[in-house]
From Swiss-Prot:
UniProt keyword annotation of Ribosomal protein present: yes
Gene this chain is encoded by: rpsS
Tagged with keyword rRNA-binding: yes
Disulfide bond residue pairs: none
Family: Belongs to the universal ribosomal protein uS19 family.
Classification via InterPro entries: Ribosomal_uS19, Ribosomal_uS19_bac-type, Ribosomal_uS19_CS, Ribosomal_uS19_SF
SUPFAM superfamilies, sorted: Ribosomal protein S19
This protein's name: Small ribosomal subunit protein uS19
């Protein structure tokens, strides 16, 4: 379910201030639920995934998505492959 238009997008206050002040530097954030806005285009943001920070470069196609969508919290291990046996 999407957020109400009346409320607007969510962007953490401290993250918004960092974007306005430090346009060119890397920004560290723990706010995975913040929405990507057009002011963030071209910025490297380090998003915390629970263990370490993942570096994400913001491009135009990401606008409207949440920051957490680009920093996975779980590591996917592939499913086991079935071994084909020769018939006798």
């Amino acid at each position: 379910m999407s957020r109400s238009i009346k409320k607007g997008v969510f962007l953490h206050k401290s993250l918004f201030l960092k974007i306005k002040n430090n346009k060119l530097e890397n920004i560290k954030t723990w706010s995975r639920n913040s929405t990507i806005i057009p002011d963030m285009i071209g910025i490297n943001i380090n998003i915390h995934n629970g263990k370490l920070f993942k570096k994400v470069f913001i491009v135009e196609d990401m606008i409207g998505c949440k920051l957490g969508e680009f920093s996975f919290t779980r590591k996917f291990k592939s499913h086991s492959k079935k071994i084909k046996r020769k018939k006798k």
